[in-house]
Amino acid sequence: MASTGQTNNYKQGYSSQTVETQQTRRAESEAAFLLPYIKKTDYILDVGCGPGTITVGFVKYASEGRTIGIDISANVLGRAKAAADEASIPKEGPGSIIFEEGNILEGLAYPDNTFDIVFCAHTLGYMPPPDMPLKALTEMRRVLKPGGILATRDTIEQHFYPRSMDLDRLWVGHFRRAVLKGDPEAEDLSPPFMPALFRRAGFDADGGKVHISTGSTVFSGATTRQWLANRAESQLQPGDPLRRSWLEAGITEDEIHETLLASKKWAETEDAWYAALHCDMLAWK
């Protein structure tokens, strides 16, 4: 399913550095809050699966079920298929996995009440509230079976330490401006509003069918800091989608340059570190 500009707000693009970051994610790190609820026979959909490292990880938990991963990028799906092939996972039958092009905002090609579990990580946070994420949540709920689980993870806070490096403003703040398309009236990104959005999408928040929790990611050490700085440099090069989105949001070339200098200095600072807080949502249809 092809995507259009109106239904694709993903700002980071699929540069090699970006995809390498996504490939570090695993089911055990990004979906630990969901794993205890997966049954061996479950039919699972992973929305915005990227290079498929989380999706592939679901197969051992749904070893007698089936798993599908969808993404808007045909290129990154090629990596996902390669990951499944490398793990010798079949494409049909019990314990199988397939990857398909799809855009949640353009509607999914699956009938109502199809999946036991729908998972979506680090995707809704790129959708300015309320309309885009609400549309996505409503569509994911549609394809869930009655009693099925929708699980989402999105980042609600990011911090770079020491704070004196000012990367909370330069990196996190500029990223926020890009997602919100420079709208000065926008209140915040989508993740802090997830409980309210789940309620509006039709989940019974007052009946004990919506659970909210948090998780975290920490990056530290010289090698990891340099890796993050290299990613920032790659993403802010001319022609990269992230740089383009920053410019479209009104972020200047001087501000981009300042961000890159701060990122480099942070990477070279002994004992500097990064922490992210994630909103983990579980909801039963």
UniProtKB/Swiss-Prot annotation:
Q: What InterPro entries does the record point to? A: Methyltransf_25, SAM-dependent_MTases_sf
Disordered: annotated span: 1-22
Gene3D superfamilies associated with the record: Vaccinia Virus protein VP39 (3.40.50.150)
One GO biological process term:
methylation
Q: Which residue spans adopt a coiled-coil conformation according to this UniProt entry?
A: none
One molecular function GO term is: methyltransferase activity
Signal sequence span is none
The protein's job, in short, is: Probable methyltransferase; part of the gene cluster that mediates the biosynthesis of luteodienoside A, a glycosylated polyketide consisting of an unusual 1-O-beta-D-glucopyranosyl-myo-inositol (glucinol) ester of 3-hydroxy-2,2,4-trimethylocta-4,6-dienoic acid. The HR-PKS ltbA produces the trimethylated polyketide chain from acetyl-CoA, malonyl-CoA and S-adenosylmethionine (SAM), and the ltbA cAT domain then uses glucinol produced by the glycosyltransferase ltbB as an offloading substrate to release luteodienoside A.
How does the annotation summarize its subunit structure? Monomer.
Question: What is this protein's record name?
Answer: Probable methyltransferase ltbC
